[in-house]
């Protein structure tokens, strides 16, 4: 009640007697009744008919709290009642009776919202506005809704229910049976009476409105409204401004057309309404699910598209970038392909050669089981390492650094040679010198020979330590003789191998052995740069219950400090703490220093590369790329391991310069057969391709043979022997080829054919004709054509040609066209003129010679 002097009028429906009406005038307390209200001139009154005496067929919808009152009558709000917020009738659901709302200052009942189409003059496309009339209300023009109708003249019905008055209104063209006054229709059907009320804005020609519906004033406006499908504005005296008279409808044809234009989709929409990006970045291979995620699409949509392209895939299948680009192109998305392998490579830091200094040698102790390897290391370190080992046999790789009178030496204690080979198979080369321990009382054992083979395959110098010379059965001379038969000739006997006779238990000859190691290191001139970021190799890694992932790292170059971010294999981390081989905390580790490092987010493999990084974020990115690279099946390349050689791909390795010799491992049923095959194959070596038998022996093909072949990039030949399923599975995993034979000459013939394919074929050149350039014709868009006279032989279009001028070969290539006059020909013989166009060459000169020749390729044979 904003205006204190304003009169609130409420239209109330009365009884069936149309002549009896009650006027309800409510004024605020304190107003002078004799003084006219300034807000109403002439005075406005709201006339309502009294409630009908009988209930209508359809039950009214009373509001809560109105019990005991007429369902149509609404009491005027009191002065202390809070003002109700006006709600848009356009927001109400179509087909459902709207709730009564207070739409005018005086309060009153609201009627159903108009169903008329949009009014074009109205700037608001959502909210409908009820008509506010300034003139007196019309008593003879009530319109009902769902059975609620007035009893007076011209009541309008809905759904076939007609009021008892004169001229009841029907539904959808059905007109009331009254005598003609006030029949109301539906959807454009108007009653002929006075003041009929319709539905959706279509009303009879009499001036009278129902509820909040606008109403055309003249018949011309009615026709215009009907033809346009929209309501019109009403102009009244005293009003210069046009008012909107239409509520908004969301189901009309015009509205549908409007919304299609207004909200037309212009983008391809993916999951959750997110648009497909214009460009994405992919690796060479990508999972279907990952592609869908990058394109904001559902995986099912991507799979469906690929099926239409003829590919049966699942969400976990991997497709190449070319296929992904074709699919993305259908969505208007461009694909940028990046190399995943390049993302896994750490850019090498530039070194200053002046910063390089001598570094300690890294020594690996190898030999047969129980020949005294760990005891020797224990004696050197003067500590009790053996007591911590299970049963006195080494169970893990240990790395230790000892200080001697002449300098530091780093020792690797391996369980036999398996770990040594495993690290080499992963591309790691950590050892500078191998110390081969042989028991003086036991002699050369099979594992000793395998250790020799591994060391030679790694191209690492070997020092021999003949242990247990204090025992009565010791025979060092016999050991030296046996080893000389396997290529380890002693310096005392004119060879190049240094021998040391020692007793690890009695500490005999240890100093001489250490002196030999340092002497060999001086010859090798081992250097490193301690001023750069650390670079090394994982020696071993484990999961410690108290410290998490712990890795033993051999620093090969640079210096590692606490807090440095790093990448270890496919994992990343930051150095949380470092320990030396005695378990003491240290702050930094220099070249050739073995350190235990904590702070890794995983357990890397032995032999994995270790690189300190400048930025932790970069370390994580490289780690993620390596994990992705490993996931899609390229783990070998991610850790630096190259592809393995087979008899079928040897030629490719030769062309790439990656293979200069063919390495073979021979296993036979008896040692005599193995030696015979070895001698036969070694005779196939040529200056271009050498055949190297790195190991031969009797017995079945075992896991160690596979690991040696993997580390050496060699083939395995089995003669009358087989590998068990476990070994076969390991060979497949490592990419090692195993060939089986039963006849010796089959072995020799197949290897011979493979090596002949590696030989560079012999090429024989035959000149078939020459021609002299007499004239040059310049043709636009084609190039220069040489007018020639064939002097000897013939010029063939398919032949190779060379252009010779002043005795110098100017160009070699192929003919692009050969013509006689204007005709294309295949050859031109001596004595005839011809036109020659050379592919990729236009610098012809008169007097130059064009020579045609053929090349014959002859396959070479091994002699």
UniProtKB/Swiss-Prot annotation:
Protein residues bound to GTP: 367-374, 413-417, 467-470
Principal location class: cytoplasm
Record-linked SUPFAM superfamilies: Initiation factor IF2/eIF5b, domain 3, P-loop containing nucleoside triphosphate hydrolases, Translation proteins
Gene3D superfamilies: P-loop containing nucleotide triphosphate hydrolases (3.40.50.300), Translation factors (2.40.30.10), Translation initiation factor IF- 2, domain 3 (3.40.50.10050)
Comp. bias intervals (Polar residues): 224-233
Localization of this protein: Cytoplasm
Purpose of the protein: One of the essential components for the initiation of protein synthesis. Protects formylmethionyl-tRNA from spontaneous hydrolysis and promotes its binding to the 30S ribosomal subunits. Also involved in the hydrolysis of GTP during the formation of the 70S ribosomal complex.
Name the record gives this protein: Translation initiation factor IF-2
Native source organism of the sequence: Leptospira interrogans serogroup Icterohaemorrhagiae serovar Lai (strain 56601)
């Amino acid at each position: 009640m904003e205006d204190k002097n304003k009169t609130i009028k409420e239209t109330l429906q009365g009884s069936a007697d149309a002549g009896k009406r009650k006027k309800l005038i409510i004024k605020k307390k304190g107003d002078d009744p004799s003084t006219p209200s300034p807000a109403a001139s002439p005075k406005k009154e709201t006339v309502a008919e009294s409630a009908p005496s009988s209930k209508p067929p359809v039950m009214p919808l009373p509001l809560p709290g109105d019990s005991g009152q007429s369902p149509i009558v609404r009491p005027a709000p009191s002065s202390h009642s809070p003002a109700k917020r006006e709600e848009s009738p356009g927001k109400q659901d179509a087909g459902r009776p709207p709730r009564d709302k207070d739409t005018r200052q005086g309060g009153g009942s609201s009627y159903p919202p108009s169903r008329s189409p949009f009014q074009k003059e109205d700037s608001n496309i959502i909210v409908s506005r009820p008509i506010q009339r300034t003139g007196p209300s019309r008593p003879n023009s009530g319109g009902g809704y769902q059975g609620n109708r007035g009893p007076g003249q011209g009541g309008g019905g809905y759904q076939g229910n007609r009021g008892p008055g004169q001229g009841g209104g029907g539904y959808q063209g059905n007109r009331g049976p009254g005598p003609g006054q006030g029949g109301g229709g539906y959807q454009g059907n108007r009653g002929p009476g006075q003041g009929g009320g319709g539905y959706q804005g279509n009303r009879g020609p009499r001036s009278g409105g129902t509820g909040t519906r606008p109403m055309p004033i003249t018949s011309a406006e009615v026709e215009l409204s009907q033809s346009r499908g929209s309501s019109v504005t009403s102009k009244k005296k005293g009003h210069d401004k046009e008012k909107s008279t239409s509520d908004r409808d969301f189901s009309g044809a015009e509205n549908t057309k409007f919304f299609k234009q207004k909200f037309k989709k212009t983008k391809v929409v993916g999951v959750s309404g997110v648009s497909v990006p214009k460009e994405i970045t992919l690796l060479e291979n990508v999972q279907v699910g990952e592609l869908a995620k990058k394109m904001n699409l559902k995986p099912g949509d991507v799979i469906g598209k690929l099926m239409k392209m003829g590919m049966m895939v699942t969400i976990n299948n991997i497709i190449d970038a070319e296929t992904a680009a074709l699919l993305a192109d259908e969505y208007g998305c461009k694909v940028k392909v990046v190399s995943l392998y390049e993302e896994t490579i750490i850019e090498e830091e530039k070194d200053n050669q002046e910063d390089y200094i001598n570094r300690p040698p890294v020594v690996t102790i190898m030999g047969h089981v129980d020949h005294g390897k760990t005891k020797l290391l224990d004696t050197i370190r003067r500590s009790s390492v053996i007591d911590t080992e299970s049963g006195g046999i080494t169970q893990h790789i240990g790395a230790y650094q000892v200080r001697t009178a002449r300098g530091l030496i780093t020792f690797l204690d391996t369980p036999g040679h398996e770990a040594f080979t495993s690290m080499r198979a992963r591309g790691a080369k950590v050892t500078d010198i191998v110390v081969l321990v042989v028991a003086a009382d036991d002699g050369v054992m099979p594992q000793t020979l395998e250790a020799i083979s591994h060391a030679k395959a790694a191209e690492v110098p070997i020092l021999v330590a003949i242990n247990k010379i204090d025992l009565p059965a010791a025979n060092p001379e016999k050991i030296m003789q046996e080893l000389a038969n396997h290529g380890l000739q002693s310096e005392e006997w004119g060879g190049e191998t240094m021998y040391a006779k020692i007793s690890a238990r009695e500490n005999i000859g240890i100093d001489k052995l250490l002196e030999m190691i340092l002497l060999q290191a001086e010859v090798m001139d081992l250097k490193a740069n301690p001023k750069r970021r650390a670079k090394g190799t994982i020696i071993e890694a484990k999961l410690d219950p108290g410290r998490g992932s712990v890795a033993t790292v051999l620093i090969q170059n640079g210096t590692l400090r606490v807090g440095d971010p790093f990448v270890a294999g496919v994992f990343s981390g930051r150095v949380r703490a470092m320990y030396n081989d005695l378990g003491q905390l240290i702050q930094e580790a220099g070249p050739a220093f073995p350190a235990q490092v904590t702070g890794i987010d995983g357990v890397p493999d032995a032999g994995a590369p270790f690189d300190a990084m400048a930025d932790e974020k970069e370390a994580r990115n490289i780690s993620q790329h390596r994990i992705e690279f490993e996931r899609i099946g390229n783990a070998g390349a991610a850790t630096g391991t190259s592809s393995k050689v087979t008899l079928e791909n040897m030629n490719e390795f030769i062309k790439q310069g990656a293979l200069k010799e063919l390495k073979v491992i021979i296993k036979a049923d008896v040692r005599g057969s193995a030696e015979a095959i070895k001698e036969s194959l070694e005779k196939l070596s040529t200056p271009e391709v050498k055949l190297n038998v790195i190991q031969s022996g009797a017995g079945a093909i075992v896991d160690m043979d596979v690991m040696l072949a993997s580390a050496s990039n060699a083939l395995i030949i089995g003669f009358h022997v087989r590998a068990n399923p476990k070994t076969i599975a390991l060979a497949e995993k490592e990419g090692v080829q195993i060939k089986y034979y039963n006849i010796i000459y089959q072995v020799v013939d197949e290897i011979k054919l493979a090596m002949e394919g590696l030989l560079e074929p012999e090429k024989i050149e035959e000149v078939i004709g020459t021609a002299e350039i007499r004239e040059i014709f310049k043709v636009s868009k084609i190039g220069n054509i040489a007018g020639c006279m064939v002097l000897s032989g013939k010029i063939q279009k398919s032949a190779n040609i060379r252009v010779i001028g002043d005795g110098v070969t100017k160009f070699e290539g192929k003919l692009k066209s050969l013509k006689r006059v204007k005709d294309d020909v295949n050859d031109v013989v001596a004595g005839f003129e011809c036109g020659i166009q050379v592919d990729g060459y236009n610098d012809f000169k008169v007097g130059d010679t064009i020579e045609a020749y053929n090349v014959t390729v002859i396959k070479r044979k091994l002699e």
